[in-house]
Amino acid sequence: MGAQWKVKHKEAAANAKGRTFGKLSKEIMIAARAGADPDMNSRLRLVVEQAKKASMPRETLERAIKKGAGLLGESVNFERLTYEGFAPHRVPVIVECLTDNINRTVSEIRVLFRKGQLGAAGSVSWDFLYQGMIEAVPAAADADPELAAIEAGAQDFEPGEEGATLFLTESTDMDAVCKALPEFGFTVQSAQLGYRPKSTVDGLTDEQMAEVEAFLEAIDNHDDVQNVYVGLAG
């Protein structure tokens, strides 16, 4: 794992698709506050790319943009909250939320953390890097990820899923790297800012791993949770 936690089991992953669209809709609405045109709003453009990769229906995507931009006469009032703490067996976790009711979210997240340990701000984030994470696929067979990373200004790169490459950037450089990668033979599929662990917990037994995964799944299932980052090997 070692970064953003994702549902592993096929049935759970299928059920999670609707939640994924809900999470992306929130991000789109917030980004669209700064303008409904992705060409003029880099933050919105990046979230729209994520939504397209997730196969969000076009109608859902466009409605979220219009709602966030105030074109439907509805107000969007979400607040960002970040929680730090530990899953069972001292596995470090960072949880990002978007909520329209802070008191509700605080109360419910505290309950979910009873099987782990909720920490103070900074209790685990010191052991994570806040980075841009760009998933891109080669547009040509001879595209060189190392050359592309150097020339586009990425910090590093590593193999991604299904033949993609994950380019890692400084948080402030992500948009510039996204724009530069096509010049060096890569098509950007998604890009987001997030946390990557500097070190990970390993050596857990199957039973212990099952406890950690059950904890993470319960957190991720909460409607207000956007992202779960975990320092867990494997």
UniProtKB/Swiss-Prot annotation:
Highest taxon of the lineage: Bacteria
What keyword terms does UniProt attach to this protein? Cytoplasm, DNA-binding, Transcription, Transcription regulation
Keyword set includes Transmembrane: no
Decide whether keyword Secreted is in the record.
no
Q: Name one GO molecular function term.
A: DNA binding
Its Gene Ontology biological processes? Answer: regulation of DNA-templated transcription
Where in or outside the cell it occurs: the entry states: Cytoplasm
Q: What is one cellular component GO term in this UniProt entry?
A: cytoplasm
Q: List the disulfide bonds.
A: none
Indicate the family of this protein.
Belongs to the TACO1 family.
Q: What is the protein's given name?
A: Probable transcriptional regulatory protein Psyr_3028
